[in-house]
Amino acid sequence: MLDKVLKIATRQSPLALWQAQYVKARLEQAHPGLKVELVPMVTRGDVILDTPLAKVGGKGLFVKELELAMLEGRADIAVHSMKDVPVEFPEGLGLVTICERDDPRDAFVSNRYASIDELPAGSVVGTSSLRRQCQLAATRPDLAIRSLRGNVGTRLSKLDNGEYDAIILAAAGLKRLQLEARIRQPLSPEQSLPAVGQGAVGIECRLDDAWTRGLLAPLNHTETAVRVRAERAMNTRLEGGCQVPIGSYAELKDGELWLRALVGAPDGSQLVRGERRGPAEQAEALGISLAEELLDNGAREILAAVYDGEAPR
């Protein structure tokens, strides 16, 4: 069936196109002769740029249109940044492949200052993420944190125009766009716990499409998949979308998983942290157990405020 064309649904931002091209190249390398095409599309999250993401509401702002294309047969797979993938999928679709994780860290970017510690009181820092915002506000309550939307290039332009003294972006995105030189300080997980799945690329497809699933199998990276599975299980129990003040990061060494997570009040006034260690085979159970602990320790109330009064059960 190599005469059939595999179609990839993708957003049109430079970073999304990089990710789709990366998957295309990996597929062509694994299956010589396979024809792969990109199907660029615009999502709701790409259109609504004048409102902070947390206020736009809804889960899957960056993926729904791609999923519709797969359900209607206009595309075979969709390539996502894992941190944008909702915890639930439409019937018939699922996440079947997670590629090897790139740098999971956040990055401090500034033209004038080399680190967060160097920022004077009152400095304006841009981020669209409640997760980054709550952690930054907790350590530096003297900073002015402002919403920052748009693709990576747009955000850097706003920094360069002087609208912000510094901005926080995902290190992986900057590296993929060959903008690593803009990173002044990579932020360790201790400084800024990453988003669920940050740095990993995931591939979604129709679950009954055996041909496509077979083509995707060689791209799956088992260690990354285990780590992201633990992070996503924790996030699912917290009913987290891609715009919630939730951080989670799993590391795997010699078969043992170390999972850290936090839920924070957006203003940084409260951060609830926890961690779990256990065998990789129990990735989901560790994630759920950690989520329960966070909920019992105050995360339920924080999330109820973020979700307009609806706390995770």
Curated annotation (Swiss-Prot):
A single GO cellular-component term on record: cytoplasm
Native source species: Klebsiella pneumoniae subsp. pneumoniae (strain ATCC 700721 / MGH 78578)
EC assignment: 2.5.1.61
Subunit and interaction comment: Monomer.
Signal peptide: none
Family membership noted in the UniProt record: Belongs to the HMBS family.
Protein name as it appears in the record: Porphobilinogen deaminase
More info: The porphobilinogen subunits are added to the dipyrromethane group.
Cofactor note: Binds 1 dipyrromethane group covalently.
Function field: Tetrapolymerization of the monopyrrole PBG into the hydroxymethylbilane pre-uroporphyrinogen in several discrete steps.
Reactions catalysed according to its record: 4 porphobilinogen + H2O = hydroxymethylbilane + 4 NH4(+)
Pfam families: Porphobil_deam, Porphobil_deamC
Pathway(s) of this molecule: Porphyrin-containing compound metabolism; protoporphyrin-IX biosynthesis; coproporphyrinogen-III from 5-aminolevulinate: step 2/4
Domain of life: Bacteria
Database matches in Gene3D superfamilies: Periplasmic binding protein-like II, Porphobilinogen deaminase, C-terminal domain
GO MF term (any one): hydroxymethylbilane synthase activity
Keywords: Porphyrin biosynthesis, Transferase
Record SUPFAM superfamilies: Periplasmic binding protein-like II, Porphobilinogen deaminase (hydroxymethylbilane synthase), C-terminal domain
Cofactor: dipyrromethane
PROSITE patterns: PORPHOBILINOGEN_DEAM
Record-linked NCBIfam families: hemC
Sequence positions bearing S-(dipyrrolylmethanemethyl)cysteine: C242
GO biological process, one term: protoporphyrinogen IX biosynthetic process
